Amino acid sequence: MVSRPGDLPALEAGPGSSEGLLGGMSIPAGMTRRALSYDDNLERPMSPPPSDINISNLWKRPVIPERKFARLAEEDESEGGVKQSASFESTKPIPVVKAKASSVMNSLIIKQTQESMQKFEKQAGLTDTGYTPHKGLNAEETRYHRLAESMHKLQMQSTDAKEERQPSSNQSTPAGTPQSSPKQKRRGWFNSQGSTASLTGSEMSTSSSSSVDLASAEGPIERWGVFGPRPQVSKSTTDPGTHPDTSGGFALQSYKGAQKPTPMEVMKAQATRLAEDPTNFKAPPKMEIPTMDGKRQVTRPHKLKHRDMNVLTPSGF
């Protein structure tokens, strides 16, 4: 087989000749050569490559095999060949700027989101009129740098609106449960009042046992502070409450049933017990120690008889 200058050497030389690399064997139809375009190999069986395929050709125009669409191109040319040639000539000399698609898409997406944010800013009235741009930045760029500030403003405005919607004078008299008390506790990232409120709540909670219970169940008792200064209850914590203290804005009545002892009281009671009878705590270990020793003395000696040795010796002896 004579190879033309543009061809790649075929592995199979033909059915009749045995000069090929593999003799009479040919490559199975499913395997494709590296240099051929896949469109041709899908339709026709394996054959030596046509003369117009070259390695340099493949690099320059790999997308469309021209032989396949030659007939279509001829028909188009017969209809309006002049228009086609003119359009081809006009499109060829345009310079091509190469860029990664991912970077282009990223910049497009960023720009689009920023523009939509600015639209929203204008609608919500968040734009800063007295804003002066940085020396090194254009006015276009400074709009994008203000996005974080505008988002922060938006959050602050929304929280303010929520707080205004909840009127503080819903109830003129306090309700029985602390959950429905009129002052709403404001929660936010930027509020630094929570720590001070909890401090005052813990200070106030030491006045009476009922308020201790409230503080443990509800948290800081800062929400009861709407009704004026809190009345000081001059009763000891162990006293069962006999009369309600009605001098303040609402009745403070201590719980008459069984009250939880505070941890300090528990510690004091334990200390007094220890002082009264120290033998109670030291007696159990003293009682246990001799019995344990007695048991150990009983179980310690092992006297093996001669008849028991056959259990301990291996069977081969």
UniProtKB/Swiss-Prot annotation:
Compositional bias ranges of the Low complexity kind: 198-219
Subcellular location: Cytoplasm
Enzyme Commission number: 1.-.-.-
Major enzyme class: oxidoreductase
Major place of residence: cytoplasm
List of residues that carry Phosphoserine: S181
Protein name (Swiss-Prot/TrEMBL): Putative monooxygenase p33MONOX
